Amino acid sequence: MTYTYNDGGRAESGRKGQTGDCVARAVAIASGRPYSEVYERLAKGNATQRKSPGYKTHRGNRGKNTASHGIATTRKWFKDYMTQLGFVWTPTMTIGSGCTIHVRADELPSGNLVLMLSGHCAAMINGVLNDTY
């Protein structure tokens, strides 16, 4: 598999340092939208999502106007946003099936993909993994 270092426009938007914004980077890369636009939309979604008791978000991000510490990708607002961008959710695993699809160009469809991985999110463009690590 081919890999390309791509921060999705994060540095160009003026942000510095390390952070947990892999969802914003992956969506910006795969959608072709500016990082700052995607980041702001995800931050707004985080800030306005319902604060359910016991619902965990990455690093306690719930209710904060930020996308730099993870996004609750299972929330309806996130799924609606991805649909608005033209993405279609395609599950590759079912409960009890084990891992049958891997991050390999020959096992995934071509085109612009946002890969929801275990604890991480990355973009794949026509078989080329675009990420920062």
At which residue positions do the language-model features occur?
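Active-site nucleophile-adjacent alpha helix/oxyanion-hole segment immediately C-terminal to the catalytic cysteine
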Residues: 1-60, 68, 76, 80, ...
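Conserved active-site-adjacent core of cysteine acyl-enzyme catalytic domains
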Residues: 49-119, 125-128, 132-133
